[in-house]
Amino acid sequence: MSDRKAVIKNADMSEEMQQDAVDCATQALEKYNIEKDIAAFIKKEFDKKYNPTWHCIVGRNFGSYVTHETRHFIYFYLGQVAILLFKSG
């Protein structure tokens, strides 16, 4: 199990879905080392579980300004890695 601490910075999402995002990201970080692969894993899992179209950005340093569907947005840190996950389109 991972010792990465989850810190949710901003969320417009149910508590259950937030926990799912953290769990999914934890799995992705254990499975992959490349940020693009981590993002792809999370995006595909959320597309499967909560229907398309999800978008995921993973990294240590990025700015963002996105439009998202209501109740389908989360921005959080898992250890040193920031994860932005949102549904749009």
UniProtKB/Swiss-Prot annotation:
Gene3D superfamilies: Protein Inhibitor Of Neuronal Nitric Oxide Synthase. Pfam families: Dynein_light (PF01221). SMART domains: Dynein_light. InterPro entries: DLC_sf, Dynein_light_1/2_CS, Dynein_light_chain_typ-1/2. It is found in: Cytoplasm, Cytoskeleton. One of its GO terms (biological process) is microtubule-based process. GO terms for molecular function: dynein intermediate chain binding. The keyword Cytoplasm applies. Keywords: Cytoplasm, Cytoskeleton, Dynein, Microtubule, Motor protein. GO terms for cellular component: cytoplasm; cytoplasmic dynein complex; microtubule. Its main location: cytoplasm. Acts as a non-catalytic accessory component of a dynein complex. Belongs to the dynein light chain family. PROSITE patterns: DYNEIN_LIGHT_1. The keyword Kinase does not apply. CDD domains: DLC-like_DYNLL1_DYNLL2 (cd21452). The gene is Cdlc2. It comes from Drosophila melanogaster (Fruit fly). This is Dynein light chain 2, cytoplasmic.
